Swiss-Prot record:
Top-level taxonomic group: Bacteria
Keyword Ribosomal protein: yes
Subunit annotation: Part of the 50S ribosomal subunit.
Family: Belongs to the universal ribosomal protein uL30 family.
HAMAP family in the record: Ribosomal_uL30_B
UniProt keyword annotations, A-Z: Ribonucleoprotein, Ribosomal protein
Short name of any one Pfam family annotated for the protein: Ribosomal_L30
Gene Ontology biological process terms, A to Z: translation
MF-aspect GO terms: structural constituent of ribosome
Gene name per UniProt: rpmD
Claim: Ribosomal protein is one of the keywords in the record: yes
Gene Ontology CC terms: cytosolic large ribosomal subunit
UniProt-recorded name of the protein: Large ribosomal subunit protein uL30
Length: 60
């Protein structure tokens, strides 16, 4: 069973490139401090790596 990750948007996407905004939206994050729980897959880890300066990640 894959581990679960709790991903929280902690910095705003205002002024960020469109690809970073799209990645945040694809993770399911909308507003600041919104949190989603996702399974740890290579795709999700790649998305987190791309916007690591905007999000915080914890094990759920």
């Amino acid at each position: 069973m894959a581990k679960k990750l709790e991903i929280t948007l902690t910095r705003s996407v205002i002024g960020r490139p469109q690809d970073q905004r799209a990645t945040v939206e694809a993770l399911g994050l909308k507003k600041l401090n919104s949190t989603v729980v996702k399974e740890e897959t290579p795709a999700i880890l790649g998305m987190i790596n791309k916007v690591s300066h905007l999000v915080t990640v914890k094990e759920a």
